[in-house]
Amino acid sequence: MALPIKFHEHLQLPNAGIRVPNITFSNVTMESDKNIVVREMIGDQQQVVIIDLADTANPTRRPISADSVIMHPTAKILALKSGKTLQIFNIELKAKVKAHQNVEDVVYWKWISEKTIALVSDTAVYHWSIEGDAAPVKMFDRHQSLAGTQIINYRADAENKWLVLIGISAKDSRVVGSMQLYSTERKVSQPIEGHAACFVRFKVDGNQNPSNLFCFSVKTDNGGKLHVIEVGTPAAGNTPFQKKNVDVPYTADTAGDFPVSMQVSAKQGIIYLVTKQGYVHLYDVESGTRIYSNRISTDTVFVTCEYTATGGIMGINRKGQVLSVSIDEANLVPFVTNQLQNPDLALKLAVRCDLPGAEELFVRKFNLLFSNGQFGESAKVAASAPQGILRTPATIQKFQQCPSTGPGPSPLLQYFGILLDQGKLNKYETLELCRPVLAQGRKELITKWLNDQKLECCEELGDLIKPHDVNTALSVYLRGNVPHKVVQSFAETGQFDKIVMYAKRVGFQPDYLFQLRQILRNSNPDHGAKFAQLLVSESENGEPLADLSQIIDCFMEVQAVQPCTSFLLEVLKGDKPEEGHLQTRLLEMNLLAAPAVADAILANKMFSHYDRAAIGQLCEKAGLLQRALEHFTDLYDIKRTVVHTHLLKPDWLVGYFGSLSVEDSVECLKAMLTQNIRQNLQVVVQIASKYHEQLGADKLIEMFENHKSYEGLFYFLGSIVNFSQDPEVHFKYIQAATRTGQIKEVERICRESQCYDAERVKNFLKEAKLNDQLPLIIVCDRHNMVHDLVLYLYRNQLQKYIEVFVQKVNAARLPIVVGALLDVDCSEDAIKQLIINTRGKFDIDELVEEVEKRNRLKLLNHWLESKIQEGATDAATHNAMAKIYIDSNNNPERFLKENPYYDSKVVGKYCEKRDPHYAFLSYERGQCDAELINVCNENSLFKNLARYLVKRRDFTLWEQVLNEENVHRRQLIDQVVQTALSETQDPEDISVTVKAFMAADLPNELIELLEKIVLDNSAFSEHRNLQNLLILTAMRADRTRVMEYIQKLDNYDAPDIANIAITSELYEEAFAIFKKFDVNSSAINVLIENVNNLDRAYEFAEKCNQSDVWASLAKAQLQQNLVKEAVDSFIKADDPGAYMEVVNKCSQTEHWEDLVRYLQMARKKSRESYIETELVFALAKTGRLTELEEFIAGPNHAQIGQIGDRCFDNGMFDSAKILFNNVSNFAKLSVTLVRLGEYQGAVDAARKANSTKTWKQVCFSCVENGEFRLAQMCGLHIVVHADELEELINFYQDRGHFEELIALLEAALGLERAHMGMFTELAILYSKYKPEKMREHLELFWSRVNIPKVLRAAEQAHLWSELVFLYDKYEEYDNAALTMMQHPTESWREQHFKEVIAKVANVELYYKAMQFYLDYKPLLLNDLLTVLSPRLDHSRTVLFFNKLKQIPLVKPYLRQVQNLNNKAINEALNQLLIDEEDHAGLRSSIEAQDNFDNITLAQQLEKHPLVEFRRISAYLFKGNNRWKQSIELCKKDKLYKDAMEYAAESRNGELAEELLSFFLDEKLYDCFAASLYHCYDLLHPDVIMELAWKHKIMDYAMPYMIQVMRDYQTRLEKLERSEHERKEEKAEQQQNNGMTMEPQLMLTYGAPAPQMTYPGTTGGYGGQPAYGQPGQPGYNAPGFM
């Protein structure tokens, strides 16, 4: 019986590059059957692998740092979790969708819909929407029953009203499932024991709405159960679902199995339940009936999802196989019917899933109900039958023929009503329903049914509706895909825009040009443009649906220029070269009909591939000069047109010149000036201004000058001068402006331009002799020609312009002007007056310099005094006055001290050579440090310099003067120490000076300075910092004086100074400081750490007798390995603080007794665990086992287990035994007892420990010491762990204990936890050491061994029989067959071989098997071929035996398979029969099978010595229409009867007449008469009469002639009778003409079949209508088009 399920392997994850260790529940997720996501570690980098199940060959890898990844069920969206950080990322958009930082760790998460992720923490469950920015929403708290469980699943119903959380945990050697069912409406939870669950919306028979069902399965000690219950309140009108509670079978071998996942197909109503050990169970939701169970995987299936393609389930097992299970639609119903003997369930499944297999049941039920008059029920059965098996014309005919049973609707109407309620009608049902409805005029019903998708649309239905409603018919044609009728209907309804779109969509090609012409003639031309546009825009492969030129012709036929223009503008917007002729045509039609439109088109520059020359000429004729110029390329044409500037836009014309060459542009400009300079000058200037860079300014200037147009030159140059750097342009502009009287512009350009030649312009302006000299003044002022300017103006009597220059133009030039006037001997009074009158700003220093150079400084005295009196505070004025006072010795010292405005540097510099004292005063007043130091050094003013430095308090200045390169440093230091510091009382002065000496690294001078301050009883003697500095400086400069200062001084920082002394290696001085200030702990540290004298330290400690001193000494002694002395010192210090160091040192030096003393003291002070732990170990080390036992028996904080380990590691097994026993560490105790040789005790301890590692250690030790009985006891606890089995076996085998190992495994097979590895390894051991036992072992336990592994072992051991057995069980039939053929003496068994060979996949093995049988078992060869015949290539098989010349051996096989009508078989068998001269068999063969070369065989048999074979040859010729050849052969062998029969069969009169002639020639008159009978209808009576008369055998021909006369008579009588009947019918028809033959149709009457015709109608689409019926348009009827 075929299985009711389909099992398919989609993928193996290892083949996609996934390593098997990564295939785990935590690393692999599958949220849907679209994608699989795997987290994988590659080296040090973690990656996520995304496998698209639609494209498994191309997995996507991305680096990640997340610890969990789940993929969106349908979209390319990843959810990633790293710790408490959650993130959603869109892979396609490469963008982060959402992120959240969770408060709790998420232990499980899952997509429960396309928009929601469920998050499960240790305490609660949350829902997180991927839409918006909202954080996860808490749904409910976890129930306490799920505490400590591993969450494996979470499910929600369709409306998220019911939620269930599922977890598992280990309890009492089994896996317990815990579930929490939660209602979001009632906010309550219910704990349930269960392992797998899901929700489903399922519609129960009789209910209007689906029920919300909750399905879950549980495995307990009492067995497995599946529960199906309804949750929530049933929908209104629904009958509550009856709870189902059914058993889930678990065998003894699967006692540890339990459900892991569940999926329910809502459409099929089937539950798919998968268990841990790979079993799948199928249940019907409605009845709870178990449909099928089987094992689909030997490995655990740890993740599943719904397989949407078939409604089944998809899962992944530990090996990485991606498997799916679905129902087999072809076999499910037969399986339920025959195997389960449940026809009711089979019917339900067939209806629910629309499955085949129950046709007979439905037909029987329908016929029974129909025969009983239950038409309503039978209609329901017919409507619900799967795959429409009862929805046939025969069923409709049945309902049409049955009478109406009462006032209600007729059976046919009931049937159609049920069909409409359940779904869509088929084509025949639609037509039968719509005919009477349309006849009654109720087309709204049809419209309603069409909108509800209840009718199957077809051409016939559209034709039926079209006379009543064209739009509805169009809808039907569209839905029924009848393109030619759709296009026709669109045209009739004016929906032209839809024609192209529809035709393209369905691939139909209508006559578009015809449709376009119809639109242009009968409709708005604009619609034609739109339609034409569609013909182009909806093109395929870049080609329009109609030729563009022909489309344009269509427009031109009706003179539709504007619509055609609109169309072409849209079509040609791509501006392609191949469209040039169309562009030309577009422009031509508009230039002739609408020049403005053409102008707009050209203005937008839409086209570039038209005939420019032709269009240019047309533009000129149309008055579009601008467009004509754009198209002209000949200079003559351009010059002819361009001079008409009044007809051209200036802006455009300027832009146009940009497209001309330089030479052409200049020529055109000249032509424009020559034609009409007044009219064209302005535009010429504009053009020249814009293109001067390209045309060349020199050429343009020359052009204007040649036409003597200085005005044009002025305007041209004025437009470019501000941007030009050409000196010539600027000069020409100044010239043009001067000549046109534009003096203000001359002033501006002279003032602003940077490019003209100043000398050339100055000379031009002098020669021009302008009335206004301001341009000349500006040029000379800007270019420093003021001296020349003053000379020119003074000599030309233009003094007023000198005053204008300094007073209005540039007052800053006054000093130069004064100097120039002095040079020309101008009077002092005039100069003074000029200075006084000049109110602008000028440089007084420069003025003073100019006057001073000419020894006329006193000239400024009164002017300067007046300025000071006016309140002038500028430095220049006061500097000049200071110089005058110093030179005149007019009380300068007072001026220098009191005047705040002069520049100290300037005046000081002026005084240096005249009086250094005045220079010092000036520099001091301005803090000019560098100048002051320099003047003091040069003039030995060190005392003044020292006072200045102390008061200045500037470190930079001190650094400069105290530099060792300063030759005057010593003199300055002496003045600082002797004079400057003695005079000051400001501590800040002292501080800065001392710091400066320190920074200058002058320790000796600093000591000298500090002694002066500190030791000479000054005001700063008790200053702490100064005392510190003195001692520190002495440490650095003179160490011999340090002890003296320590003793003399008391107000210094002793700890800091002592520490510095230590770093300076002044240990005695540091010790003296600590001792002086009673810091004894630090003092002894100096003796210990620096002086390194423990004896002095010990003496010092005895003197002090302080705990901290003793502790410091003890630590030092400990570091020097003086352990006993250190312990004594620690005890004197009574300090347990250093117990860590003491323990480490005593342990290193083996001073365990001293350690005991110290730790006993320390224990009194502190009950630290470490102290007591080390005391225990020290007692163990000293062998004080009694004290040890007493200590650990009492209260303590020691780490007994840790000490036990240390004792064990150090070989102190007696102590370890005591300690391990104390803490009940039986695992370690057992190993310790093994070391002590107490094996029985070790086994007992191991039993208490119950640890695999312990069992291994004890077992191995027992094996090593020959205690095999105890070793076996231990081994039984090891072998049940598959991971440990290999190590155990290797240990035994390496030591040669094979018998004991086999005994151990044999004893272990009966254990409850026996697993596959044990059976496998025992089989391998049997193959190596006891091959005689292997067969029995495999026959008993083949299903529990790892067959591939045992296969290798059996092959290596040459156990061929066992190898075949395993290959058979493993379904490797190819290898099994090969092995039997290679080793037949040991492994071949006839029946077994035939069973195996029929299952092999490799067809080549069939032929190897044939050869094998030929070699070893030739008599059984036909039996083998019988078995293989369903799968053999019979042609190849025949060829195989032909090559070996063994065809006779396989004759039975050939007989058996001849019914296949294979050519090779037929020819081989026929040849064999020929060889055997079996003509009867050959005749039978060729009559039964015709697939062979008939002609070749006929030709072969034609020459055969036996007549029967030649007769067969004639038969074959006849069968191949070689009648003549066949008859000739019969005549040759005198087979006259055959010849007559063949001549009759040939239907050839000539052959028949030839045969008659042959008989007459041979005087075979009887055969002649017989031939007349056989060939009666082929012969001509006149020919026969002639032959008979010639040969005088009329008697032989007379029977033939009598029969001919009778036939002629009969035909005449029939013809007369037929004519008489035709006349009667015609008369009757004329008499009945005009009568109505049929009543109005009603729905209950039904409709005639499409092929039927009514009386008075002719049938067909083009026939005439019946009387009283409307005409139907047909293909041949008027009005169709």
From Swiss-Prot:
Residues 22-65 are annotated as: WD40-like repeat 1. Clathrin is the major protein of the polyhedral coat of coated pits and vesicles. May play a role in yolk protein clatherin-mediated endocytosis by oocytes during oogenesis. This is Probable clathrin heavy chain 1. Residues 1616-1635 are annotated as: Disordered. Its main location: membrane. Residues 148-193 are annotated as: WD40-like repeat 4. The C-terminal third of the heavy chains forms the hub of the triskelion. This region contains the trimerization domain and the light-chain binding domain involved in the assembly of the clathrin lattice. The N-terminal seven-bladed beta-propeller is formed by WD40-like repeats, and projects inward from the polyhedral outer clathrin coat. It constitutes a major protein-protein interaction node. Residues 300-328 are annotated as: WD40-like repeat 7.
